[in-house]
Amino acid sequence: MIKAVIFDLGRVLVHFDFSLGYRQLEPLCGIPADEIPLRVAESRLAIRLESGELAPREFARELGQLLGFEISFEEFCRIWCSVFTKPTLIPEALVEAIGKTHRLVLLSNTNSIHFEMLWENYPILRHFHACVLSHEVRAMKPNPQIYQAAIEAAGYAPEECFFTDDIAEYVAGAKAMGLDAVQFQSASQIEAELRSRGVI
């Protein structure tokens, strides 16, 4: 029996499109927006931020040096957070209903810049009983360490926890830890999966 439901954040609860931020950085650094993510990936700066190795201000400074722009930290955060769009991908009412009968845990590869903004602007997150965030755990999916942290936050055995994520590799990592995991495709699909398990 499922006693806890664990949700990924990006592209499961909320939609994001990094190109929205890259297009704002393009005129500041003179690098084409479609080339910026390649440079960011090669630098591993975002991974270092989301794994807790880099503090937000260090990340902003090093990214500015990498790409060649100089703006205030506040302006950088505004641009970096502009990648998220509303509405939520899963209805808040569904998440709220689940939270009344089951332990709700958020499990996300994220950073404090994004999460602080999301927490303030997306009330859906307030229904979660626990948040397991990569920059706090200092481990990113599919590292077993972060799944173990989520299992502990849920407070139940792995097989009693349902998990959904949009990335197949992360679903596989969860299954390897014993979680009942399904790749997210749509709200209706996840609702059906939860209904079939007696969660809703």
Located regions from the model:
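Active-site neighborhood of HAD-like aspartate-dependent phosphohydrolases
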Residues: M1-A41, A176
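Asp-based, Mg2+/Mn2+-dependent phosphohydrolase catalytic module
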Residues: M1-K3, F7, N111-S112, E116-I200
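Structured helix-beta-strand junction loops
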Residues: D8, S43, K100-T101, H127
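Generic structural signal for small/hydrophobic residues in well-ordered secondary structure
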Residues: D8-R11, G52, I98, L106, ...
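Alpha-helical elements of Rossmann-like donor-binding domains used by nucleotide-donor carbohydrate transfer enzymes
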Residues: L20, Q24, R44, E58, ...
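Metal-dependent phosphoesterase signature
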Residues: L45, L49-L89
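Short, acidic loop-to-helix structural element flanking the phosphoryl-transfer center
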Residues: E74-V105, E116, P144
